[in-house]
Amino acid sequence: PIAGSMVLAAILLKLGGYGIIRMMQVLPPTKTDMFLPFIVLALWGAILANLTCLQQTDLKSLIAYSSISHMGLVVAAIIIQTPWGLSGAMALMIAHGFTSSALFCLANTTYERTHTRILILTRGFHNILPMTTTWWLLTNLMNIATPPSLNFTSELLIMSSLFNWCPTTIILLGLSMLITASYSLHMFLSTQTGPTLLDNQTEPTHSREHLLMALHIIPLMMISMKPELII
């Protein structure tokens, strides 16, 4: 069910990061060098999850693996134990909660009209539902952390803290972000462009679907541009 996927991606997946943040406050302070294997493992796991995304043909699986790759960055940022890293991790958990939930919602919008989640069979939506294509574009741009979204702010904080801790990590981070951009572009082009395989009886989008997407996108913009709204 779509509601379960949205709650799982937006809330339940973030409980692990929240638990690590709480445990870090309880544990005695240790040298960050002790956590080097875990930071490398988290970043390498993010890259592997991103590479897995490139191999997916199922839309829902692709979005699910995308969530896993972002949580790798969150874990790496928390373990460094710097204020910037912690702020970036919390911001990315909030930002990705909105983004992944919006992507699952869009995937369900596509599934309700095509009755399939295979990427190649859902193409050509820009001819039939242009407004939905706009939502897909905005959400994918958020997923690859373009300004002025909260994703950009959080990834900038994480990148700065990781680079300050160890400049070599910029290689793993850069590779991860490059692959993220690749599969996001692949997902958008596969589902929206090209000749459509649907008939002319496709159900139009409802106002509730547009409202739902607006309630995902607007907070991401507003929290980044006016953080005093929540702080």
Curated annotation (Swiss-Prot):
It is a multi-pass membrane protein. The chain crosses the membrane at residues 1-21, 34-54, 61-80, 84-106, 118-138, 156-178. The keyword NAD applies. GO terms for biological process: ATP synthesis coupled electron transport; electron transport coupled proton transport. The keyword Transmembrane applies. Belongs to the complex I subunit 4 family. Keywords: Electron transport, Membrane, Mitochondrion, NAD, Respiratory chain, Translocase, Transmembrane, Transmembrane helix, Transport, Ubiquinone. Its EC number is 7.1.1.2. Core subunit of the mitochondrial membrane respiratory chain NADH dehydrogenase (Complex I) that is believed to belong to the minimal assembly required for catalysis. Complex I functions in the transfer of electrons from NADH to the respiratory chain. The immediate electron acceptor for the enzyme is believed to be ubiquinone. The gene is MT-ND4. It is an enzyme of class 7 (translocase). PANTHER family: NADH-UBIQUINONE OXIDOREDUCTASE CHAIN 4 (PTHR43507:SF20). One of its GO terms (molecular function) is ubiquinone binding. It is found in: Mitochondrion membrane. This is NADH-ubiquinone oxidoreductase chain 4. It holds the Pfam family Proton_antipo_M. It catalyses: a ubiquinone + NADH + 5 H(+)(in) = a ubiquinol + NAD(+) + 4 H(+)(out). GO terms for cellular component: mitochondrial membrane.
